[in-house]
């Protein structure tokens, strides 16, 4: 199964609490084994349970792709060591890089797959270039989606497709498609929520959406992320 509905302690905002890549899922601590098993089955990657800066909102703080995970500079040493140790135990050769910036909500401010990264205009040009180097992408741009600077919360992109805020223009969709090298659609989740990045955990193998997501929304999400046809 490549798509499932789930809640985290009755919250439908799964993307707030985790960061999925094609190699690993960083996830908040304290979820039951049944939910972890659903995530493993759908996303098909190992799970590393952790906090970041003693907080459960791992998806807001962490961004990443198959090459690297970027975390705030202020991550606790024990948390960073836990993530690195777990990656090593799983046999995953992947960088985890604390990023020195006044900004900490990196997951909300960075949208990336393995080809490219779109970062918020809140970052300087120098910071954007540094993020691109860490993520090992071919291209990095500063920009907005549908007039929102929090590009990571209003979008989801994988190596197979992407979904963004329904107010994104046709010109933005074309630009994003060229940047990321995949088709980009508009849509919502959790009964009309436009901040799709906060509503789901997705990679190239599957997607787990908030439990309030409707049938028509699921069809659009499947299409956008390359799971139809």
UniProtKB/Swiss-Prot annotation:
Alphabetic keyword roster: Initiation factor, Protein biosynthesis
SUPFAM superfamilies, sorted: Pentein
Cellular compartments per GO CC: cytosol
Pfam families: eIF-6
Keyword Protein biosynthesis: yes
Single GO molecular function: ribosome binding
GO BP, sorted A to Z: assembly of large subunit precursor of preribosome; cytosolic ribosome assembly; maturation of 5.8S rRNA; maturation of LSU-rRNA
Family label: Belongs to the eIF-6 family.
Function: Binds to the 50S ribosomal subunit and prevents its association with the 30S ribosomal subunit to form the 70S initiation complex.
NCBIfam families registered for this protein in UniProt: eIF-6, PRK04046.1-5
Name recorded for this polypeptide: Translation initiation factor 6
